[in-house]
From Swiss-Prot:
Belongs to the DnaA family. GO terms for biological process: DNA replication initiation; regulation of DNA replication. Residues 105-121 have a biased composition (Low complexity). Plays an essential role in the initiation and regulation of chromosomal replication. ATP-DnaA binds to the origin of replication (oriC) to initiate formation of the DNA replication initiation complex once per cell cycle. Binds the DnaA box (a 9 base pair repeat at the origin) and separates the double-stranded (ds)DNA. Forms a right-handed helical filament on oriC DNA; dsDNA binds to the exterior of the filament while single-stranded (ss)DNA is stabiized in the filament's interior. Residues 97-121 are annotated as: Disordered. It is found in: Cytoplasm. Residues 72-199 are annotated as: Domain II. This is Chromosomal replication initiator protein DnaA. Keywords: ATP-binding, Cytoplasm, DNA replication, DNA-binding, Lipid-binding, Nucleotide-binding. It comes from Burkholderia thailandensis (strain ATCC 700388 / DSM 13276 / CCUG 48851 / CIP 106301 / E264). Residues 1-72 are annotated as: Domain I, interacts with DnaA modulators. Disulfide bonds: none annotated.
Amino acid sequence: MNDFWQHCSALLERELTPQQYVTWIKPLAPVAFDAAANTLSIAAPNRFKLDWVKSQFSGRISDLARDFWNAPIEVQFVLDPKVGQRSAAGAAPLAPRAPLPAANPAPVTAGPAPSGAADANAPAPAGMNAATAAAVAAVAAAQAAQAAQANAAALNADEAADLDLPSLTAHEAAAGRRTWRPGAASANSEAADSMYERSKLNPVLTFDNFVTGKANQLARAAAIQVADNPGISYNPLFLYGGVGLGKTHLIHAIGNQLLLDKPGARIRYIHAEQYVSDVVKAYQRKAFDDFKRYYHSLDLLLIDDIQFFSGKSRTQEEFFYAFEALVANKAQVIITSDTYPKEISGIDDRLISRFDSGLTVAIEPPELEMRVAILMRKAQSEGVSLSEDVAFFVAKHLRSNVRELEGALRKILAYSKFHGREITIELTKEALKDLLTVQNRQISVENIQKTVADFYNIKVADMYSKKRPANIARPRQIAMYLAKELTQKSLPEIGELFGGRDHTTVLHAVRKIADERGKDAQLNHELHVLEQTLKG
């Protein structure tokens, strides 16, 4: 077991960057191997590392284990805080990498260290490679920051915990003002863990595992731009869309990317309900100074589901002040909601105008190809081979959001494992029988016709009539498009339900609306509202 892990670690060290290896792989350790069951247990020191390694590296480690033992090995990940302590005590060194080009790290700007502290800018001793030099420099910078603790602006840790406000230590405050150097963040694994815990980020949600399609490509492009240029591009960034479409994934991805690029950045992800709770507690304990000091000092604020601010005037007032302070300091604000900013009821006009001052992007329900890709990617991450036929069948019948797709896949995998059967379309139909019945019953062409007619203030009878004025023909085409997108009806069946129209008429309407949706923001918004209404 230990021989395998030394072999595996050596290979991964060569494949990954120094930062990735030291942060994610080096803290791991094998703790058990069951030859009879062909299972290998690998321990991680905390939940963050466990979740990240499981999602990002389990496949590669399983492949290496299979090659090493010439048999399929199930790799299991377990939590063991003592692993980090053993790792810190010093493991046997692995085979060295090939020499790296000399680094040219930027100077540390945390302020001069007092006498006796290590000099972060001192030249590396002769013979020290770039990765080691970067690590030494990072440790020196941390020592300098700790020495300057008396001068750092931070919250009292006890007061912060009372309000769910992680304390900002002097080390973090100084690190937030440093220019990042590749590899430096990995010098202190515990510090990296602390950053994740304080930020409340989920390290599993990254750009790498975010499936992109037409429905979300603009949102992803904007998110990457913001991650690369926080506080400069699109401030605030406002993402809106229905439940389970990837809004939360994207904003965590921005935070994770910034934390990798600037490990000392002061980042906070918070759900709007928790922010409301913090405001209430601050009011009850007369701790608004602490509250403001914390939120106004962030480099990146990620606030999810801001529609929960509706009707809460004091919360909105405090958020307005925080927003103004952050934007003035070139800090980035990212917000999500289930609807377009101007359609959120009970929100102060001042806030709505601030939301509109940046970039507002909709995330739509995933199209068919994207749904197939999501299922294939998720199955792969679970170590399961899913045929395209099965993925296509599921994607064709479940259209609303990513969570629904992932939930369906979990049902299929569990059903397959329980019955000991291969995953086929027949098994999938059995596993999803109840879900498919509900889906087929939920949305009918008749319901679509009525909803669209009400939305555009025309009569339902106009959907079947031969009238062709624009105020009737356009909604009728939209209803045909939605019927094709949201039901299992064929083109001829849809045409029959629209007054006996030919299937080519329906096809023309579907193509016309689909094409215009990508070009016309107003039409896209109207379709989004109709889809959400029909899906309840």
